[in-house]
Amino acid sequence: MKEKENSLFNSKMIKRAMKDSFIKLNPKIQLQNPVMFIVYIASILTTVLYVFSLFGIKDNSPSFILFISILLWFTVLFANFAEAIAEGRGKAQADALRSAKKDILANRIESIETKEKVSKVNSTELRKGDLIIVKAGEQIPADGDVVYGAASVDESAITGESAPVIRESGGDRSAVTGGTQVISDYIVVKVSNNPGESFMDKMIAMVEGASRKKTPNEIALQILLVSLTIIFLVVTASLYAYSEFASNQNGVINSTSVTSLLALLVCLAPTTIGALLSAIGIAGMSRLNQANVLAMSGRAIEAAGDVDILMLDKTGTITLGNRQASEFLPVDGANIEELADAAQLSSLADETPEGRSIVILAKEQFGIRGRDLSSSNAKFIEFTAKTRMSGVDFNGDEIRKGSAESIKKYITEHGGDFSDECEKKVEEIARKGGTPLVVAKNYKVLGIIYLKDIVKRGVKEKFSDLRKMGIKTIMITGDNPLTAAAIAAEAGVDDFLAEATPEGKLNMIKDFQKKGHLVAMTGDGTNDAPALAQADVAVAMNTGTQAAKEAGNMVDLDSSPTKLIEIVKIGKQLLMTRGALTTFSIANDIAKYFAIIPPLFIGLFPELSRLNIMNLQSPESAILSAVIYNAFIIIFLIPLALKGVKYREVSANKLLSRNLFVYGLGGIIAPFIAIKGIDILITMLGIV
């Protein structure tokens, strides 16, 4: 079963991360993070300088060099630990998935007609296009599409949800996933991929990070960080030569050591964000996995953070999706109780949510209870797509209910009359966003049942929050424009696309993209595939077809259309976290500059004492304090990098102002306080 991590850490994860921290000291791995590679080289150099100092070749006091060397190694290890702990969360999820994936015997058949002739083969021998039969109690050995039959399937190994789902041939519920189990009946499945290419294989690879590539934003930020590091490297290297020149000019001894300058370089380089950058990206992917969403790339998550157009399906996302009877509206002087009675009689054999709600409404409003008509020679008329109505013939009466067009046709063909009053009420209900069902008895209209598609509680507030963030919401529906406009107004969406077709959705996405917008949408059917392939963030439902899943760049394992809003929030949280910690890291440099530069060169330039605003005890204590802070701030920020900066539904300008205040100003003030405190402590302990 897919596990969800509720806590950031556990003992097993920490032990594995600590072990991996040392494994990551491999130079090839360190080279992947250029900023931390500089710290890695500085750690090696200070270690060599310490060994030299033991043989009398002194750059500084051996104890000072040893302290600096240990702290620099800790800085590298802490960075490795941050990345390893983020990867560990993914590995834990991958282990749970791998336990559900095992080689099993499959029942391969030649064709549906000869399904009784079964050959047993290992699941690893199955190839794309093979037909397999899976019976109750058996595990589905490979991904595919149901081409015959229907069955109840337990997908808890993938989704974590214990409730079984129906998978059947045809339509948008035909896709099945290897590793899931058939609970009842049997199905014939056409295998959709070769070994190693299954949905489960992709999930394991993604959550382990095996196929994770740096996103364009990550690469751009890393280029900035490397550029800053190179600048500081050049500056630090030139400082040694300049200090030698200045000491000769002033006739004083040059107290600036290579160890001190290496410590200065590490403190001034953006090591905090350099250490946490990879962990932030991995953690963003992990948070998405915990939300039961599989992203095909980190780029998709970042795009979710930049999205400014959300295309949302009405049914299931904005409305509850099951229309409920809310009112009986008599016409042409008909009695409302007679209308309710006729409506209930015509719905007694109707097992749809709408039919059951009509029976309940008649009982609640008029005390009319359901009756057993099986012994009364009642003849129930089932709803069909052709007639678009249902009903009952009972005690010589013909009762029908259905769409206005179908009932109008039915009664006019039998010499009845469809009044203007009825036409007006039908139009009025449609304008309000409801669905009118007309009820007729013996070719005479009694009235209308007002079916209301209930807008989900709280969606209007959600859309208002999204609007504040600069995100435009568009409702996609197959309803007529009048109904769509009414529901759109009630839900508070910015726009809508009524009577939506696959071509209409695709063209709308293209139009928005031409104007520079980033578009997100959800889909589950083969007809959604073109639009999903075009969208910047395309979330396919796990219950959807193989074509939809292949077209999307994310798959929602819970198949919940509302998940798109959560995905956008996770994407924005990822970008906010990266920006906040970058701001904090660069702001830190200001305090570290004032901590190290004045004490380091005060012997050459006494005037620099004015810049020693922290009044640190000595050059050695100042450098040690700054390096200690530089190392341990990484550990303190790991929980924030993994959990993410708290997300708020406010405008981009307000978010920017808040983050500049908290992480910019905070990034300047925090090191001043911490470095001064560390300086006092190490002086009291007599370390320097």
Swiss-Prot record:
Main location per the UniProt record? membrane
- Positions annotated to bind Mg(2+): D524, D528
Keyword annotations for this protein, in alphabetical order, are: ATP-binding, Cell membrane, Ion transport, Magnesium, Membrane, Metal-binding, Nucleotide-binding, Phosphoprotein, Potassium, Potassium transport, Translocase, Transmembrane, Transmembrane helix, Transport
SUPFAM superfamilies attached to this UniProt entry = Calcium ATPase, transduction domain A, Calcium ATPase, transmembrane domain M, HAD-like
Against PROSITE patterns, the record matches this protein to: ATPASE_E1_E2
Q: Can you state which reaction this protein catalyses?
A: K(+)(out) + ATP + H2O = K(+)(in) + ADP + phosphate + H(+)
Purpose: Part of the high-affinity ATP-driven potassium transport (or Kdp) system, which catalyzes the hydrolysis of ATP coupled with the electrogenic transport of potassium into the cytoplasm. This subunit is responsible for energy coupling to the transport system and for the release of the potassium ions to the cytoplasm.
This one is known as Potassium-transporting ATPase ATP-binding subunit
Q: Which organism encodes this protein?
A: Clostridium perfringens (strain ATCC 13124 / DSM 756 / JCM 1290 / NCIMB 6125 / NCTC 8237 / Type A)
Q: Which gene encodes it?
A: kdpB
